[in-house]
């Protein structure tokens, strides 16, 4: 009904069949409204991040409501699992992990693709820093980090390259000093 008040009940105090009809209509309408309200309560919990609740099981053709709620919950649990997997991998320093974006559609797919991009950028940039540090450890002071980096990765590149330049200068000074020593 188009009115603003959906809680109005038909008076049931009519005599005979009219009272029974009013009671039957009220029962049907309010069973549906109660089911919808219960589903909305669960949906609000899902929106707040609480995925522990299940929608009320409904009989017959009304089962479509809890089936839709179950599908929404399954989708939210699946995206949550992917995010937890990537977050755990990143916290453990394993940026080679990727989420399965093809399992999702629309914004969920975009979310996983963006997380995968973040993991890929971190993996590549940290990998380059690791290669530079390995080269320095092996005595190669010609190695540098080159490329487009942003934010903390740009600072790491610049700091690493400055460190190599400083080490090169120090080693050069030591070599010059050692060459001037006569025995």
Where are these predicted regions, by residue range?
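Polar/charged heptad-repeat coiled-coil helices used as signal-transmission/dimerization stalks
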Residues: 1-183
């Amino acid at each position: 009904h188009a009115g603003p008040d959906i809680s109005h009940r038909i008076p049931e105090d009519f005599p005979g069949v009219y009272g029974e009809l009013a009671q039957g209509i009220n029962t049907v309408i309010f069973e549906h409204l109660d089911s919808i309200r219960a589903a909305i309560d669960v949906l609000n919990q899902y929106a707040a991040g609480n995925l522990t609740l299940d929608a009320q099981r409904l009989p017959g053709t009304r089962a479509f409501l809890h089936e839709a709620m179950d599908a929404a919950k399954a989708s939210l649990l699946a995206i949550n699992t992917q995010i937890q997997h990537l977050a755990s991998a990143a916290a453990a320093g394993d940026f080679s992990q990727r989420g399965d974006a093809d399992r999702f559609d629309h914004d969920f797919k975009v979310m996983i693709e963006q997380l995968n991009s973040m993991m890929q950028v971190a993996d590549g940039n940290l990998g380059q820093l690791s290669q530079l540090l390995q080269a320095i450890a092996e005595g190669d002071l010609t190695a540098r980090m080159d490329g487009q980096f942003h934010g903390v990765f740009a600072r790491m590149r610049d700091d690493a390259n400055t460190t190599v330049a400083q080490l090169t200068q120090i080693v050069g000074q030591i070599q010059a000093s050692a060459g001037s020593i006569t025995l």
